[in-house]
Structures are given as structure tokens and as C-alpha cells.
Curated annotation (Swiss-Prot):
Keywords from the UniProt entry: Lipid biosynthesis, Lipid metabolism, Magnesium, Metal-binding, Transferase
Catalytic reaction(s) noted: isopentenyl diphosphate + dimethylallyl diphosphate = (2E)-geranyl diphosphate + diphosphate
Organism: Mycobacterium tuberculosis (strain ATCC 25618 / H37Rv)
Residues the record lists as binding Mg(2+) 2: 91, 95
Organismal lineage: Bacteria, Bacillati, Actinomycetota, Actinomycetes, Mycobacteriales
Documented EC number(s): 2.5.1.1
Gene3D superfamilies, per database record: Farnesyl Diphosphate Synthase
Domain notes: Contains two aspartate-rich motifs, designated as FARM (the first aspartate-rich motif) and SARM (the second aspartate-rich motif). Rv0989c contains arginine in place of the second Asp in its FARM and first Asp in its SARM. The primary role of the FARM and SARM is the chelation of the divalent magnesium ion cofactors that assist substrate binding and catalysis, but it may also play a role in determining product chain length.
The protein's enzyme class: transferase
Induction: Highly up-regulated during the early stages of invasion of the human blood-brain barrier.
Annotated site, Important for determining product chain length, chain positions: 92, 217
Protein name (Swiss-Prot/TrEMBL): Dimethylallyltranstransferase
Residue numbers binding isopentenyl diphosphate: 54, 84, 101
Segments carrying motif DDXXD motif: 91-95, 217-221
Length: 325
């Protein structure tokens, strides 16, 4: 989810939000057909507030084609978002996190077993939706899902001893986040009838902007006015990019930070760890990576028609940078 973003022209913005609403409505309709034993669990988090990023990107990419409101666009957007919602269930179990989208997570409201099954059901529903699309579109969904699961496994296992930790982190970001957003753009553009080059360009743009947004979220979690990290978050084995950069420094402050992040952190020490992170070069270096990904995303814009959709995508790229400033 991201906060509401102005896309410029009011009518264009209204059309985009109508497209997102159709996707959300289809998701709710499909999940409402679940057996009563799991209906409440699988519907959790669908309407958690904010603008769902993957449906937004699907609908924006669809504006490049001649049929942006086609049913295939809605089905594809719903399938991708359901896959994302499924991973939220599984991620929170792995992370032992009690919040998701600023809402108590499935594993907190119910149990880990319930959360895993709810995630599985969302994946199954996504597959059912994707099966309504043509074989090429179905293949895009399947390949994105395979890449996503690979990223989840890579994140869970951690980097091998010979792999640079930052290189590992960025690869995971591309696999876990970039994969679905790239697929959102590719499907939105392809199913609305956009040209082949535009489809390729918007898919690459999506991968870059997805990475930028993911890192921005990691930065905001540390540097925001109301930082969202708990002691459990900070003590996780999987550190975020600002943390990884901060831990590479060789200073007394970094030595203390390394000591704090070596294991579970008592909540009494969270403020100290956040202060050390905020005073380190880690946040600035992570912001530079966000800017680099945003620049790569902008490189794709000249290959898209100079119309409102392109300007809206440019706004989205700018938002990725400004969000963490």
C-alpha cells in the first residue's frame, strides 16, 4: 500500500481509481466464495487502507493500450494482488511479525497454521483467476510467482559465505518485490493492446520502481517521524539496506550498533539502535540506491507515448524518491 498519489489530470486519476476499484471488487468477490471455515481469514488485509501498488501499476500500464478497461486487465490485476496478499501471510509467519499494513497480521489474529493456509488459499484463487487469461498471460503470472518464491527462499536462507550481503539483499528485492510489479506492468500493457516495445519498457520500469519503493519503505521504517521497527524487527537476521550499509562502517558507534543488532533487542534499546542508525551513513547510501533505481526507471519513459499515462508514471517515480526524503 502507498498513500494517495496525485496523477495530474482529475479525469485520468478518476479512471485509474475506477480500475483499481474493479480489481479490489473482483478480489473480494472471489474470496467471498471461500468456505465459511476460512472466509474471514482469507479476506483479512484486502481493504487495509491506502492505494494498493500492484493494482495501481497494472491499471496505469493498461492506459498505454487501446482497451484499458478490458476485463482481462482487471483479472490480471486481481491475480497479481492476490499473490502479493498470499506472500504477506507467509512472510509474517517467517518474520514472526504481529503487524501487516498497519493492521494485526493473520498469524496474530489467528495462528501461524491459519495464516499459512490463508496464504495458500489466496495463491489458489490467484491461479484460478490467471487460468481465465490467455496462455501467454498465464505464463507471465506463473513465472513471476516462481521468481517471488525463489526470493522468499533466498531471503530465508540468507547469503552464502562468498556472497556480498548487499548484493544478496538487492537480488532478494528484485525477486520478491520487483517480480510482481514488473508482471503487473507487463500484463496491464499487454492485455490492453499496447505495442510490444511499450510492454517491455513498462515491465522494466516496474521492476526498477518496485525496488526503489521497497528500499524507500526500509528507510522510512528507520528514519520516519514514527519509526515502525520494534526490537524484534531490528534483531532479525535479515537486515535491510540502511542497516547493511551502517554495519559496514568502522566506528565506535557502529561497533555498538553491531552489538545491538547481533540478536534480539530488548525494547528498551530500540531508541538507541534507531538513533545510531539515523546518525550513520547507512540511510544516505540507501537513498542513493533509491535514486539510482529511479533514474533507471526514468530511462524507460522516452519509449512510451508522451501522454498522460507517461506523465503519471513519472509522478510515481518521483514519489518513490520523495517518500524517503
Amino acid at each position: 500500500m502507498i498513500p494517495a498519489v496525485s496523477l495530474g489530470d482529475p479525469q485520468f486519476t478518476a479512471n485509474v481509481h475506477d480500475g483499481i476499484a474493479r480489481i479490489t471488487e473482483l478480489i473480494n468477490s472471489e474470496l467471498s466464495q471461500a468456505d465459511e471455515v476460512m472466509r474471514d481469514t482469507v479476506a483479512h488485509l484486502v481493504d487495509a487502507g491506502g492505494t494498493p501498488f500492484r493494482p495501481l501499476f497494472t491499471v496505469l500500464a493498461a492506459q498505454l493500450g487501446s482497451d484499458p478497461d478490458g476485463w482481462e486487465v482487471t483479472v490480471a490485476g486481481a491475480a497479481i494482488e492476490l499473490m502479493h496478499l498470499g506472500t504477506l501471510c507467509h512472510d509474517r509467519v517467517v518474520d514472526e511479525s504481529d503487524m501487516s499494513r498497519k493492521t494485526p497480521s493473520d498469524n496474530t489474529r489467528w495462528t501461524n497454521n491459519f495464516a499459512i493456509l490463508a496464504g495458500d488459499y489466496r495463491f489458489a484463487t490467484a491461479s484460478q483467476l490467471a487460468s481465465r487469461l490467455d496462455p501467454e498471460a498465464f505464463a507471465v503470472v506463473a513465472e513471476a510467482f516462481a521468481e517471488l518464491i525463489t526470493g522468499q527462499m533466498r531471503a530465508t536462507r540468507g547469503p552464502a559465505s562468498h556472497i556480498d550481503t548487499i548484493e544478496h539483499y538487492l537480488r532478494v528485492v528484485h525477486e520478491k518485490t520487483g517480480s510482481l510489479i514488473a508482471a503487473s506492468g507487463q500484463l496491464g500493457a499487454a492485455l490492453s493492446g499496447a505495442a510490444e516495445e511499450q510492454i517491455r519498457r513498462v515491465a522494466r520500469l516496474g521492476r526498477m520502481i518496485g525496488a526503489a519503493f521497497e528500499i524507500s519503505r526500509d528507510i522510512i521504517a528507520i528514519s520516519g517521524d514514527s519509526a515502525t521497527l520494534s526490537g524484534a524487527d531490528l534483531g532479525q537476521a535479515v537486515h535491510t539496506l540502511p542497516m547493511l550499509y551502517a554495519l559496514r562502517e568502522q566506528t565506535p558507534d557502529t561497533s555498538r550498533l553491531r552489538e545491538l543488532l547481533a540478536g534480539p533487542i530488548h525494547d528498551d534499546h530500540v531508541a538507541e539502535a534507531l538513533t545510531l542508525l539515523r546518525c550513520s551513513p547507512g540511510i544516505g547510501k540507501a537513498k542513493n540506491v533509491v535514486a539510482a533505481y529511479a533514474a533507471q526507471a526514468r530511462e524507460e519513459l522516452p519509449y512510451l507515448p508522451d501522454r498522460q499515462p507517461r506523465r503519471a508514471l513519472a509522478t510515481l517515480i518521483d514519489h518513490a524518491i520523495s517518500a524517503c526524503d
